[in-house]
Each structure stands twice: as C-alpha cells, then as structure tokens.
Amino acid sequence: MLFRSGRARVRAALHIVVLNLLGSAIFLIAVGAIYAATGTLNLADLAAKVATASAGQTGLLRAGGLLLLVVFALKAALVPLGFWLPPAYAAASAPAAALFAIMTKVGVYAILRVHGLVFGPDAGATASLLSPWLLPIGLLTVLVATLGVLASRDLRRLLAHLVVLSAGTLVLTLGLDSEAATSAALYYALNSTLVGGGLFLLADLIARERGAARTRLDCEQAVARPALLGTLFFLGAIGVAGLPPLAGFAAKLYILQSAYLHTAASWVFSAILLSGLLVIVALSRAGSALFWRTGDT
C-alpha cells in the first residue's frame, strides 16, 4: 500500500492498519469464546462438538459465532463495515489493488466455512446461526455498492465499489442456504475475482495513457490507444456486469436458478438484475468518457 508516496495512500494505509488491529482483537475474543466452550479450534472437531453442545455452552458459541461474522464482514467490506475499502483500493497501486481484490474474497470464504461447516443445519441449538444475517447484509451491501458505482467519478473508485458489490452478491447467495447456491457462489467468486483484478491492472494502463487526467471520468485527455485498451475494457465490463458470452453471465444465471424457489426469490432477483443493469449504465458512461469523448468535442 505504501510502495509509492502520497497523502491519500498514507491515509488509506493508516485506516487499513487500524481496522486490521481492531478486527484482530475481535477475532481473538471470538476464538477465545469458542475455545472456552468446545476446547478445540479444528473446524472438523468444532462441527462435531457444536452439534452436541450443552445449554451452558450455547451462549458462548453464539457470541463467538456472531463476532466471527463481524470480523469476516469487516474483511470482506460488507455493509455497514465496508466504508474503508473504496478510498483504500482507489489509492493503492495497480498490483496492490488487484491483489487486494482477491484478498477481499477471503473474508467471504471464511464466512462460508464457518456458516456451512461449524454452524450448519446440524449444529444443534446453534444451527444456522448466521443464516438470518447473511441475506439482509448481502442485499444492503449490493444496494450501497451499486449506488457507489453510479456515483463514482474516478475509474479506480468505481472498480473498488465493484469489489464491494461482488462481495455482497456472494454473501447474498450464501444466505440462500442450499448446495446449489453455494456452488453458484463459488463459481461467481472465481469469475468476479479474476475480472476485478484484471480491471485494476487495466486502469493503470489507462491512467498512463491519459496524462494528467489519469483515471478521472472526465474528458480532459483522450486515451492514446483506444482500440486496444477499449477492447480490453469492454471485455472486462461485460464480464463484471454478467453479460453473455463470458462466464459472468453463467455465474449470475446459476445464482438466479438457485434462488428460484427461495422465499426471498423476488428480493434476490431484483438485487441481481437491477444491480447488473445499473453497473452496465455506469461502465458504459465510464467507457464513453475514457475512449470516445475528449475535451475538444
């Protein structure tokens, strides 16, 4: 994060350090509560011991599980704990931002492991402990991130909001609580992570071609190689928006199929389809500003 100088990068790095220290402290408290109740931290052992936990251990397990959700939600930048990600990723260098886009999904994967293995449907009194939280958190994250994408006036910040949007989509899908939804989430995670990281690297190439305008979505400076960079941007845009024929379309289709019979299907369909449409609008506007218009027109 601090590979290059700059006030924005120093501020973003400071935020990341403070939040990571806070998250680590909460994580230790959560782990301590779970260990006190079960005497183990091995996930396989936890799954067995949580299922047979006594009434006296249930309180510690619930507290530990919910604290873990808070920690992993902070790592994955979910609402209301995701305020730090857009400015941090927008200020980071391209390689760092691309790596961070991958690391953000680690928080979602941790939620998947804890939710599915430790507090799954066979976890006794703590069965499906995280289920009531995942779907609402995912929906709110998708909503806030979509608004952030639309409001962005810088390509890097727009891409940072897309990272948050993909994390929200994953958590929303995990909240459906089915094997089909989990499979769809894993497929979507692979696609969104690769495309998101690639777009951050592409943003750095665009910035070098635009001079002082960098990645601002204005018309001050045209891109020197619009054909090549424009084609790459178009491919990345349809990939992240979920349009055919790229894998993003299949990933979102699998998510919708897994939600078809769920009681919250209307909310999931609305969130996925509306966010996809608005992302297309935002990326079309960004592409127009970067490749088609200049300050002389």
Where are these regions (language model features)?
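Alpha-helical transmembrane segments of multi-pass membrane proteins predominantly involved
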Residues: M1-T297
